[in-house]
Amino acid sequence: GHLFVAEQADHIELSGLVFDGSNRTMGGYTQGLLDLRRIAHLAIDNCQITGSGKNGLALEHAIGRIERSEISGAADAGIYSVEAGGLSITGNTVSDCANGGILVHRWQVAEDGTMVTGNRVQRIQARSGGTGQNGNGINAFRAGNVVISGNIVSDCAFSAIRANSASNLQISGNTCSRSGETAVYSEFSFEGAIISNNIVDGAANGISIVNFNEGGRMGVCSGNIVRNLSTSGPYPADSPGFGVGIGVEADTTVSNNVIENAPLYGMQIGWGPYLRNVVATGNIIRNAGTGIVVSVVEGAGTAVISDNIIDGALNGAVVGQRWAEPATGDLASSNDTGYAHLTVERNHVS
């Protein structure tokens, strides 16, 4: 069966209510404990939604706001929104859900404009498995113009914040602790991602702005602190492995970040031929396996690596690689890299 279903409503407002699903099985026709579809004006405030057998709160074509509510113990995601038309998800606590925290999805790539701000998301599992579909604190999928800011996200099986094919995306001012895989991920066919002023402490990889092979490009990665990364993740790693501070590929600037304790690479620039127009300047990298690795495969595009401080990189400060294999000596030791696409200068190595 179901607890609360509404469709084609002009105005629904829920305030100060407790919805407890008691972990009961739900009917196949319903998406969540509260299942609200095509709501022209939705306001949910100061509610508790707990123990859902599916999603806690499931929204389809919703416009409005969800705020100051507590959502916990969902068998799927805490909040699942699809095809929203201007939604604000603000000041909520989402915890102890089996597959996801706050999901902002669309059926096709389009503008979405959901704002996910000031929420606490914690202890999100990936009970249904996979390599990233589940286990994320905040997830934007095919949704453009989404803002994810000022959230505190901890103890997620995969990513604290994960965006797939989400263009014109802002991820800023979030605190991401103890992520099982990549803490902040912008992947697949996105165009335009600003990832700035976030704190990442504890993850397999820190921040990834990747998948130029799928058309993923155009990013700014600045002012982040990324530290205490691990070489182990929730599944056997693809090459080159886990333990990378920041990874970028195309049309992206990486500036003024501080990376500490990245056991594989402090920074990874490009993967095989998937490298174009990357500038990495003014970063500090401490205690890394290799400070910065950059692709030197035939077909790799322009990269400028300058004015960085690299302190305590065990396997070299700046090293050219062919995919996962080192192909050069330490490029930081002279200004001539021997590669036309690559400028490495004025880096301070200690």
Regions found by a protein language model. Give the residues of each.
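Short, contiguous acidic/charged loop-to-helix segments that flank catalytic cores in large enzymes
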Residues: 185-187, 209-213, 241-248, 268-272, ...
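Extracellular beta-strand-rich solenoid/capping regions of secreted or surface-exposed proteins
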Residues: 1-15, 20-41, 56-61, 107, ...
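Low-complexity, intrinsically disordered tandem-repeat tracts enriched in small residues
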Residues: 149, 196, 203, 219-222, ...
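Leucine-rich solenoid repeat scaffolds
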Residues: 312-321, 327-350
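Extracellular beta-strand solenoid repeats
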Residues: 5, 13, 35, 43, ...
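Small-residue (G/S/T/A) turn/hinge positions that recur once per unit in extracellular repeat modules
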Residues: 9, 39-40, 62, 85, ...
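Short glycine/acidic-rich loop motifs that flank beta-strands on beta-rich extracellular proteins
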Residues: 1-3, 23-30, 53-60, 75-83, ...
